[in-house]
């Protein structure tokens, strides 16, 4: 977002006659007013609410971790960006649309500071996104290094470093704008009495060529864009490979727990705890990938327009492609507002723990309206791409194959105490047979020996055996193949 290139043209026409002290609004003012001042403001208000809620939830004791600390800082920078965007761009079109001169004078008074704060917020938002991407990259691809480098202290120092860099890098922005008095309209009561112009420093050719052109475009456009694209491509590929292996490793852990002869519930509880930690890490990574790809999508057109400005020249675009260039710049501002407002929606849709904490913070209902928030993980389809339920396959002999199907509650709750006495029900098209078998038959890695089942499977058809507890609840299912 560039204020200098968006300065109001203060040379209006009245009844077709130029008025050197009057106001001439922007071209397509009605469209810009509706897009930025109306729709953009509504989206920004929602974004401020969402970012405040995000910061409130992610700082709760149960949600505190290095990744959420980065996301909290991102919410703060995005909120500052939304506030400055309103007071710079939305307010400018409101002033022109309503012809409020007093508001225009106030706008000129604070514009220089809002302009610098806008760039500081934008730089902080970009590099917090880069920092959390690198943190997730280390957690996914180099977990051992991540434990040593990405603790809470490291995250806090990184955020402090990003904030310091954002302030230092943009400190000259405080001096790029100046308001001068127009000698042709010196009374101070006309629109042209005060003129907003680039300062002498901003007009310096060396400053423009080195800082404004090459350094700013590299630091704010090319480097973060390419870095995010590269790291998130690696993360996305690693996640895809991890999800394909997720079922196998999870099933292997359950088999190991079932094979233990002592402390079976404790073993499965330990496996469940480890799986839960891995699940939370995987969810955090997937949420970040979505945030970054939306960030890249919202900033892609700004990346393209910057390339066009460097190749064709800004003056050429303004003169020969005036409509295209004008609306492209407004689209960039509008997409920046969307990008700073949408993270809350991503957390709400894809963050299971975030939804739980949201219900705790705001309660189950607001003025009688029940909040029906989804409770299932939105990425379940990724993990169950090739299956419909958790299954464990193992071979016991060369002639007979067994498949044990376990419900998810077996791993999550580790409630196996009631399995010491179970009933094996053999289901078959020819009839049903029942036989009692203890749980230790599963602990040694073998399936229960039931003579009647061998007769039933001799005709070449599989036989399904269900393990049920005293309450009649099916705990697991053994499918025997001939």
UniProtKB/Swiss-Prot annotation:
Q: Which GO terms describe its cellular component?
A: G protein-coupled receptor heterodimeric complex; Golgi apparatus; non-motile cilium; plasma membrane
Where, in residue ranges, is this chain on the Cytoplasmic side? 54-68, 135-148, 240-284, 352-482
Q: Name one Pfam family in it.
A: 7tm_1
Q: Recorded GO terms, molecular function?
A: ascr#2 binding; neuropeptide receptor activity; protein heterodimerization activity; protein homodimerization activity
Sorted UniProt keywords: Cell membrane, Cell projection, G-protein coupled receptor, Glycoprotein, Golgi apparatus, Membrane, Receptor, Transducer, Transmembrane, Transmembrane helix
Q: Does the keyword Transmembrane helix apply?
A: yes
Per the record, the major location class is: membrane
Q: Does the keyword DNA repair apply?
A: no
Q: Which domain of life is it from?
A: Eukaryota
Transmembrane stretches in the record are: 33-53, 69-89, 114-134, 149-169, 219-239, 285-305, 331-351
Name its GO BP terms in alphabetical order. G protein-coupled receptor signaling pathway; G protein-coupled receptor signaling pathway involved in dauer larval development; neuropeptide signaling pathway; regulation of cAMP-mediated signaling; regulation of dauer entry
- Bilayer disposition of the protein: Multi-pass membrane protein
Among SMART domains, the record links this protein to: 7TM_GPCR_Srsx
Which intervals lie on the Extracellular side per UniProt? 1-32, 90-113, 170-218, 306-330
Give a brief account of the tissues where this protein occurs: Expressed in the ASI and ASK chemosensory neurons, in the IL-2 interneurons, and in the male specific CEM (cephalic sensilla, male) neurons.
Residues the record marks as carrying a glycan: 6, 170
State where the protein is found.
Cell membrane; Cell projection, Cilium; Golgi apparatus
Family, as annotated: Belongs to the G-protein coupled receptor 1 family.
Tell me the protein's name.
G-protein coupled receptor daf-37
Q: What is the lineage of its organism?
A: Eukaryota, Metazoa, Ecdysozoa, Nematoda, Chromadorea
What gene does the UniProt entry assign to this protein?
daf-37
